Curated annotation (Swiss-Prot):
Gene source species: Tityus discrepans
Domain LCN-type CS-alpha/beta: 21-82
A Gene Ontology cellular-component term: extracellular region
Superkingdom: Eukaryota
Similarity field: Belongs to the long (4 C-C) scorpion toxin superfamily. Sodium channel inhibitor family. Beta subfamily.
Record protein name field: Toxin TdNa6
Tissues/organs with expression: Expressed by the venom gland.
Lineage of the organism: Eukaryota, Metazoa, Ecdysozoa, Arthropoda, Chelicerata
Amino acid sequence: MKGMIMLISCLMLIEVVVGGKEGYLLDRSNGCKRSCFFGSTSWCNTECKSKSADKGYCAWPSCYCYGFTDDSKMWHLKTNKC
């Protein structure tokens, strides 16, 4: 039983370490979230990949990205300038 708990804990830790960061794409020109009001999921996916993320989609009205590298800049509520 202890072995099973240890295995599950290790798998969860691996997911956290390997999964990368996720969040809203930062529009560096104004410090806000990158809007996809007139865009699409494929447009957001391309934008996210251009900013070193693995993939992204339009979480209307802003682009949401998965798999950012550790040095990637993303939008944060605490540093929100909008």
